[in-house]
Amino acid sequence: MIIVTGGAGFIGSNIVKSLNDKGITDILVVDNLKDGTKFVNLVDLNIADYMDKEDFLIQIMAGEEFGDIEAVFHEGACSSTTEWDGKYMMDNNYQYSKELLHYCLERDIPFLYASSAATYGGRTSDFIESREYEKPLNVYGYSKFLFDEYVRQILPEASSQIVGFRYFNVYGPREGHKGSMASVAFHLNTQLNNGETPKLFEGSENFKRDFVYVGDVADVNLWFWENGVSGIFNLGTGRAESFQAVADAALAYHKKSDLEYIPFPEKLKGRYQAFTQADLTNLRAAGYDKPFKTVAEGVTEYMAWLNRDA
């Protein structure tokens, strides 16, 4: 069996899909379906069982067994960069992850988990997986950073695989439940389908992020599991592209040209990553050599998926 926490969420459900594509269906999805919209991410997928995340944690802490577990993909977390309840964030992202990590270590179960580029904070260069480059801007980034630091202490002595992925700006299918936290591509598509003029912040040609397609993210997760490599790795494309480029790709798909530029919100100033670009040196050195989709390629594929029933 393979366990995917956050398996009804954005990246988790895409990992489930990639496992299904390899013929793997003996999957336990762990999540919190209090948000009644997330289930749609699983409707077209095949899994063996589902468990609520609180019930799962109780069983993990009690040392209960789940049969022969081949791997744990730990994607479950509060990923809102605007959530400022520090206790909730640390319980949900840090303590939970520690419990699950130790459960896996005691049983030699490969543990692959979601870290984040938010660990780098407001940097504009040198996004490198090393302590001197890490300075998160929000409690979400701090919770991810602290768990990475915890893993770094354990890695030298670990007898089983531990690998963390610092996700950059992930976009693509199965993110609709995220609402305001969904990608710019998702929101642009919604606006265009509603007959609205799509909106970007002023200066969007200067805001550049490493936008990585979720299908590529799932591919990297599965490659590392299949190859048993441990460590903490950036997971982006290695290219910074502008929000304007995302809009251009969405407009091209919809055969539109008009854009409206809106003022940048005061509340986000100083807490907003204006530039991200993954340094892929360590990822490539680990042996992962597949190319990543460009914004033009990924957004076009995503638009086709979003509008598949249109």
Swiss-Prot record:
Native organism taxonomy: Bacteria, Pseudomonadati, Pseudomonadota, Gammaproteobacteria, Enterobacterales
E.C. designation(s): 5.1.3.20
Subunit structure: Homopentamer.
Known function: Catalyzes the interconversion between ADP-D-glycero-beta-D-manno-heptose and ADP-L-glycero-beta-D-manno-heptose via an epimerization at carbon 6 of the heptose.
Protein name (Swiss-Prot/TrEMBL): ADP-L-glycero-D-manno-heptose-6-epimerase
SUPFAM superfamilies: NAD(P)-binding Rossmann-fold domains
Keyword Signal attached: no
Active site: Y140, K178
